[in-house]
Amino acid sequence: MSGQTSFYCGLLLVLLIQAQARPRSDDSLQTLSRLLEDEYGHYLPSDELNNEAQEMSPAASLPEFNADQSDLELPWDRESREIGGRPFRQEAVLARLLKDLSNNPLRFRGRSKKGPSRGCFGVKLDRIGAMSGLGC
């Protein structure tokens, strides 16, 4: 009897996993796309940068390549258009992230007014509020 019980439990588990693994509907993908764009849209480059990138690309100067490009549509390109994602360049995103990091002030990690430097093992805060180093 335990063999049949374990078989049915396993079968139930497989059916549950298959039910969870089915693809999401297009509505949920569009909703997710809108939420991500609202949340992280400021990291994407503006349309001006996209226009400059298209002008600078060597493919834009070849008319026969542009004619053939519409025939050779890749699935990930089609999906990005369907979701409403704008094409972006990794360099522009990286440049914006580095600019944001350089504009944020870094926290001073030296000696503080309340105690010694942090040393090898950090500091200990005593009951009376005094900080002492744990040594090296």
From Swiss-Prot:
GO terms for biological process: blood vessel diameter maintenance; cGMP biosynthetic process; receptor guanylyl cyclase signaling pathway. Its main location: secreted. Disulfide bonds join C120-C136. CNP-115 is differentially processed to produce CNP-38 and CNP-39 in the heart and CNP-22 in the brain. GO terms for cellular component: extracellular region. Belongs to the natriuretic peptide family. Hormone which may be vasoactive and natriuretic. Has a cGMP-stimulating activity. This is C-type natriuretic peptide prohormone.
